[in-house]
Design a protein with these regions (language model features):
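Active-site-proximal alpha-helix that buttresses catalytic centers in soluble enzyme cores
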Residues: 2-118, 149, 154-160, 204-222
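Histidine-centered active-site/metal-ligand motif
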Residues: 47, 188, 237
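Short helix/loop capping segments that flank catalytic or ligand/cofactor-binding pockets
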Residues: 53, 121, 194-195
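Active-site-adjacent alpha-helix immediately C-terminal to a catalytic or transition-state-stabilizing loop
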Residues: 35, 165-229
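Low-complexity, serine/threonine/proline-enriched polar segments
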Residues: 115-116, 120-158
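Short, solvent-exposed aromatic-acidic interface loops
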Residues: 231-241
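Short aromatic-enriched loop/helix-cap "lid" or pocket-rim segments at secondary-structure transitions
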Residues: 54-58, 103, 127-133, 197-198
Length: 244
């Protein structure tokens, strides 16, 4: 963690009655503006570009690295945030591509070597997942977008926990470990999309508007106690899926 204040996390959890605003889509410039006005911003960041994951891979590509372009995009994303605040912390789902994403974003921010905490609870061990094996079976036939659409619209899906309660638990955990002004928590598109849908930020996700690589769900904690939710479009990649 860089420049963190460990008293901040408890303060966030204590504000359970904060007014909430659903802001919609935003850019990295909007994130920087929020930091400039004293807000704290937690980015639930989709990892950068990776190769395609085979349908028979029960690990969901745990050992897949980022592509060379994906590495470059991470550094570019970090440069966009560089200097916005001296108080930054990094956390990642334990899969290789998410850890690499956080490390390379830190490098782009001028914070190479910053600690990246591995945290399964923002990855495939999160509150959203009831059974990793069942989720793999669900997506095995290539029907990822269809099955995710069903989950978000119905609030239930095989292999997943109920959307509403899972989102609450996911957010509670993320905020409980967030203690800097800016958090960069590298995770996966499944959880970014599910979170944004459940919070009412975007309820019409489909393959054309799916979170792209390095897009994120942002939780903004303003100094006056207001909590905002945003879909932050990085604008660095047109891709929703891995490359061949």
């Amino acid at each position: 963690m860089v420049g963190c204040d460990k008293g901040m996390a408890a303060d966030v959890l204590g504000r359970i009655a904060d007014p909430v605003t659903v802001f919609g889509e935003a850019s990295v410039s909007d994130v920087i503006a929020e930091l400039g006005r004293g807000s704290r911003v937690l980015l639930l960041l989709r990892h950068s570009e990776r190769p395609k994951i085979g349908y028979e891979d029960k690990t969901f590509g745990a050992s897949l690295p980022l592509t060379e372009n994906g590495k470059h995009l991470c550094v570019e994303f970090g440069r966009m945030l560089a200097g916005a605040t001296p108080s930054v912390e990094f956390r990642a789902s334990p899969l290789l591509r998410t850890v690499m994403t956080a490390e390379l974003v830190a490098e782009g921010m001028g914070l190479a070597g910053a600690e990246v905490v591995r945290d399964a609870l923002i990855g495939n061990g999160s509150a959203y997942v009831a059974s990793e094996l069942e989720v793999w079976r669900l997506f095995r036939d290539g029907s990822f977008f269809q099955r995710m659409g069903e989950y978000m619209q119905a609030g239930e899906q095989r292999g997943f926990n109920p959307l509403a309660s899972a989102t609450d638990a996911f957010e509670e955990h993320a905020l409980s470990v967030f203690s800097a002004q800016l958090g960069v928590f590298a995770t996966h598109d499944v959880y970014v999309a599910a979170f944004l849908h459940a919070r009412g930020v975007k309820t019409d996700f489909n393959p054309d508007n799916w979170p792209r690589f390095l897009d994120s769900a942002a939780i903004v904690l303003r100094p006056d106690g207001e909590r905002r939710y945003m879909l932050v479009r990085a604008g660095l990649s047109p891709l929703a899926c891995g490359v061949a």
